[in-house]
Amino acid sequence: MTVVTLGELLDAGVHFGHQASRWNPKMFPYIYAERNGIHVIDLVQTARLLTHAYEFVQKASQEKKSFLFVGTKRQAASIIAEEAQRCGGHYVNNRWLGGILTNWSTVQKRVEYLKELDAKEEDGTLDRLPKKEAAFLRREQEKLSHNLRGLINMTQIPDIVILVDPKRETTALLECRKLGIPIISILDTNCDPNLVDIPIPANDDAVRSVKLIISTLADGILEGKQSYQ
């Protein structure tokens, strides 16, 4: 029994890969066919691996593990924020600042500073400051919020990272590998599945495809939480 049907995957366009000329040969086991120069992803494999990932995050969630969702490409950004917040995860959906994981103690200080600025905005402190100073602090707040808002409740390095498009998120991928953090990732036909722990072969350019995969993983996390709530 899989957590999604082949029909649902098909309807979301999960099967559309990249141009065959752009493929990574390591994705061969997950490719069903080539049509008009485009690789077609084997949805049986996608359903199997998505189910495996779902069960993995569900169990991890039962054990109160923490999750970080990463996807900065335009098609994924809003989905990443929405689904991470829905299941109580953390997220990066604008720009990955080098060292978020490998230099977390420094990044955490910036997150704490953002919290301070938020508190000053909320209690009216900024409104009582001289205009120039208030304007400067609001610019700081906006800049930090842009890149770190999704980490506002993160107190330590996450236990599991969920990625969209590891080719784009190379720095995040390398930081996870350096620290031994398990990676679950949507992989299109141009990616290397050997770099992640649980690959989910899928179209990473279509909003509906990304939404289906990421929301299914968020569902798994929520289901795991129900066991202790």
Curated annotation (Swiss-Prot):
GO terms for molecular function: structural constituent of ribosome. Keywords: Chloroplast, Plastid, Ribonucleoprotein, Ribosomal protein. GO terms for biological process: translation. It is found in: Plastid, Chloroplast. It comes from the Eukaryota. GO terms for cellular component: chloroplast; mitochondrial small ribosomal subunit. Pfam families: Ribosomal_S2. Belongs to the universal ribosomal protein uS2 family. This is Small ribosomal subunit protein uS2c.
